[in-house]
Amino acid sequence: MLFVLTGEVQTGKTRWLGRLAARLAAEGVRCAGVLAPGVWRPRAEGAALSAEDLHAGGRAEGAFEKLGIDNVLLPCGERIPFARRADLARAAGAFDCASQSARAGLGWAIDDAAIARVNAHFRELATEAGAAAEGGEAKVPGESGFGAVPSDPSQAVLRPFAVSLLVVDELGRLELVRGEGLIEAMALLDRGPTPAFPHALVVVREDLLPIARERLAPAWGVLRSIRPDEEGVDQVRAALGV
C-alpha cells in the first residue's frame, strides 16, 4: 500500500509523521527513509514576510517563521542541513544559481550536496530491498540492528522488525515535475511493493497530488490519500496490521 500524506503548507505534516514513526516503531513497524523537519525561529512582532518567504510556503500569521529545512535519515537518525530560505541564502551570499533548486525557481535554496547524501541513503535502502528480494539478510545502512523510534526520531536505535514502512518526506516539484532532487527515492518507489518495503508513505503537497498519482500509480495501484490527523494514523496502522 502507498499512502500519500497531503495538505497545505505548514499544516504539521512532518511533525505528524515523526510521531507516527515513533508509534509504529513501538508497535513493531520499522520506518526507513527521510523526514524533513523545519528550522524555525520566533517571529519579530509586526514583522512581515518577504515575497521569497511566502513563495517558500511561509504564512503571514503565526509566532514563528521558517528559516530552512533539515533532513533526518531513518532509521540511523543522521541529521543533514538540507535547505535554506532563498532570500536568506541570497543575503548571506550563499545562493548557488546553478543548483537544482535555483534552476527550478524554488523558494528554497537546496544544497546539491545534501541532495546527494539523501540519494546515497536511498541507494543503500534499495540495496537492502534487493537483498531481501533475493532471500538474503537485509540490514539498514550503518546499523547492526533496528529498534524503536523514540519521540525524537533522530535519536532512533533500531532492532529487527517484521514489517517495514518506506518514508519519503517529501516529493516536490524537483522530483515530480523535473525528474531531479531525490531521484533515488523515486527509483525505489518505482519498484512498487517489495519484501523489504511492502508499504510506503510519501508526503506531497495538494497541488502536486494529481502528478504524484499519475507517476506512482503504475507501480502501486491505487494511492491512498491521508491527512495529518488521527484518521490518517488509523488508516496506516490498519494497513500495517498493528
Question: What are the residue ranges of the model-derived segments?
Answer:
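Hydrophobic anchor at the beta1->P-loop junction of P-loop NTPases
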Residues: 5
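The conserved Walker
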Residues: 9
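Conserved lysine of the Walker
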Residues: 13
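Hydrophobic positions on the alpha1 helix immediately C-terminal to the Walker A/P-loop
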Residues: 16
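N-terminal phosphate/diphosphate-binding loop that engages ATP/GTP or pyrophosphate donors
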Residues: 21-100
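Intrinsically disordered, low-complexity terminal tails and inter-domain linkers enriched
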Residues: 42-62, 120-164, 193-195
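Phosphate-binding/switch loop-helix module in NTP-utilizing enzymes
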Residues: 91-130, 162-166, 171
